[in-house]
């Protein structure tokens, strides 16, 4: 492949429209050839990426984001990126569906509609809600949280809302975005999201874990609960009474040569066991939650049993732990 074509991809953010490729010196025959042999990926009709670049993108964030950029590049009518597509541009966490869609909001569109993997939304927006991110016009973070909440429900809304609060958006800004949506479809879910959002959840798994623990019906758990014995400091993901809920991601136990984060899995397991023993030493119960637990009724019942067992053994008050508590971290929101 000619160097000027590779340079053209880099100059245009790793995506080339057919017109841009022709302007860079490619011929129609060359474009068809590179697509046919697999060196170029047709991300969208008339929009291409180099195979090596595309395959290096992860399927949950990178590829959906560039698919949205490609769809935007192929559109001739005015639009702004919105919903999941806007969240990805902002760097917010998104609970991606199995089949991701490109989302745009267009002025004057009569009714939302799905067309070749692009969902066109009709909801009006104010000029000040449009910001430029990575050279693209997108709806701002607060509006994006509200849109995802209305369109995709409480879990997806909370994941993005928690992420937005961590990024510096205030709860007041979220509330203002939702307040402008009076009588819109799904607005009650968006209001619930504003109320329940918590920047203490450090990732999507902790957000969903908080939702799971809340569903036990014993109140909202505290996030990022810290204890120390004067030498060691431990932060627990969630606390309800005297019971801690720790969110486990399997990547931290998986060897690095299998795509994980641990260079020594046995040591990682040993350190995690020592960590749990340290927590239990304060007469605190501990439950562990993994991703698969978020949608299982059986696991919800098991967590209920574990929580109630802690209550029977040690009660719910943590007044005796006052000398050992670490002041709460300063968090946005």
Report each predicted region and the residues it spans:
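Short gly/ser-rich loop at a beta-strand->alpha-helix junction or flexible surface loop bordering the NTP-binding
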Residues: 1-186, 222, 308-333
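Surface segments flanking catalytic/ligand-binding clefts of nucleic-acid enzymes
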Residues: 3, 7, 11-12, 27, ...
């Amino acid at each position: 492949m000619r160097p000027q074509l590779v340079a053209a991809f880099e100059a245009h953010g790793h995506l080339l429209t057919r017109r841009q490729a022709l302007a860079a010196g490619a011929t129609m025959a060359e474009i068809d050839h590179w697509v046919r042999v697999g060196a170029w990926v047709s991300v969208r009709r008339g929009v291409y990426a180099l195979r090596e670049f595309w395959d290096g993108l992860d399927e949950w964030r990178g590829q959906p984001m560039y698919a949205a950029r490609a769809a935007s590049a192929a559109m001739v009518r005015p639009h702004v990126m919105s919903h999941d597509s806007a969240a990805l541009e902002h760097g917010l966490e998104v609970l991606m569906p199995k089949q991701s869609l490109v989302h745009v909001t267009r002025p004057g569109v009569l009714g939302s509609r799905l067309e070749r993997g692009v969902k066109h939304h009709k909801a009006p927006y104010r000029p000040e809600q449009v910001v430029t991110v990575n050279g693209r016009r997108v709806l701002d973070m607060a509006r994006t949280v509200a849109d995802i909440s209305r369109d995709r429900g409480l879990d997806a809304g909370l994941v993005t809302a928690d992420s937005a609060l961590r990024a510096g958006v205030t709860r007041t800004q979220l509330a203002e975005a939702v307040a402008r949506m009076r009588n819109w479809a799904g607005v009650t879910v968006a209001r619930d999201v504003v109320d329940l959002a918590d920047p203490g959840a450090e990732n999507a798994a902790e957000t969903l874990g908080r939702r799971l623990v809340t569903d036990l019906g014993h109140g909202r758990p505290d996030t990022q609960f810290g204890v120390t014995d004067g030498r060691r400091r431990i932060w627990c993901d969630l606390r309800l009474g005297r019971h801690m809920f720790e969110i486990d991601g399997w990547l931290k136990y998986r060897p690095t040569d299998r795509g994980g984060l641990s260079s020594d899995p046995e040591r990682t397991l040993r350190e995690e066991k020592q960590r749990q023993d340290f927590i239990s030493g304060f007469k605190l119960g501990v439950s562990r939650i993994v991703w698969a637990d978020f949608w299982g009724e059986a696991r919800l019942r098991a967590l209920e049993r574990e929580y109630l067992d802690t209550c029977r053994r040690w009660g719910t008050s943590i007044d005796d732990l006052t000398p050992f508590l670490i002041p709460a971290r300063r968090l946005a929101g």
